[in-house]
Amino acid sequence: MYFHLILTDDCNLCCSYCRAKAFENLEVSEGERAVQIDESLPNEMAYDPEILYRFLESDPSPTLTFYGGEPLLRTDLVERIVREAPVKRFMIQTNGLLLDRLPPDILGRFVTILVSLDGRKALTDANRGNGVYDRVMENIRIIRARGYTGELIARMTVTEKTDIVEAVHHLASNADYSFSSIHWQIDANFAGDFSLRRFRKWADDCYNPGIRMLVDDWVDHMETEGSVLRWYPFLDPMEDLLYERESRLRCGSGYANYTIMTDGNIGPCPVMIGMSQYYVGHISRSHPLELDHVIIRGECTDCGIRTFCGGRCLYSNITQPWGVAERGLVCGTIESLRHALIAALPRVRRLIDEGTIVPGDFAHEKFNGCEIIP
């Protein structure tokens, strides 16, 4: 089983698409009003780590992902848990500003590190704060120099300010650090901000055409270089298309990937902090392999591309911050992604038949913090 572990709600940034929205006058949907939030949830991990270890011992192969807030604000806890927990596989999702604080022996235990970057310096700093891009890139070079050999994923948040083609191309090839693993998530249907946005025009004129271009670029790289870039919104669905597999919610939330709150309660998703009516247990009394499932419901269950998309996002499915028509625009981006990948499928199969690439090139860590469907 996979578990996100919330260490702290504190963060050393106030990104425009995250904490800064707390200062905006946003609409509140009926679904959001129906959510019960546990206001007593501690700001930081407030239980004895030994309770966590006993819980994890009941899982023969747990994977633990450190999460926040910014988890590296509690580097002390990260180091302690990595050294003591009965876990072989660790991951972390971080803004990257404090990565240089981790000693080499701790770094070496992480199979995957997800670092938040949105594209070029100007875009990243506009979203996340002045100097963030340079500091993060410097820290990435530092941990590589210290011997870190695991997967580094550039995790982008995509908004109307993003030229998706330019941003992905930059992160894939630049003089600072070039990522072979990239994921992006669209900032859409997560808050009641649609009336403040120009989402429709951006999706139609920039994002959807850009995805078609990027899929072509992705397959071009396979043909010329004989390797498959780990661009996760393409990688995971294409692997399923090759094997003709259907998919549940691709991030695994609510059935394979759970979140441990700062008080030890267990929820289905790291975004659903404090949503107590969706808790499925507590680390002091639950078995990690016997947790209830929290599933996608409503309009997604009857969707024609459900087995491709999986439902996109459990939190959005429950809270529905955007209206029906607006949610349809988000679904349109997924349909565009699906059409682009299906159009590229014959070419990918030809490259496999010719021996340029092999099916195993699409293998990857499941539930690694990439939602897959943007």
Question: What is the predicted function of each stretch?
Answer:
Residues 27, 130-137, 141, 145-253, ...:
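Radical SAM enzyme [4Fe-4S]-AdoMet core and its adjacent flexible, acidic
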Residues 1-47:
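Canonical Radical SAM [4Fe-4S] cluster-binding loop centered on the CxxxCxxC motif
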Residues 271-374:
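Flexible mid-to-C-terminal extensions adjoining Fe-S/redox cofactors in radical SAM and related proteins
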Residues 49-65, 74-189:
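Radical SAM/AdoMet-radical enzyme domain recognition
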Residues 9, 22, 117-119, 186-190, ...:
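Short, small-residue-rich loop/turn micro-motifs
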Residues 38-43, 125, 288-290:
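A short acidic, glycine-rich active-site loop
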Residues 6-14, 70, 254, 300, ...:
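Cysteine-centered iron-sulfur cluster-binding motifs in ferredoxin-type domains/subunits
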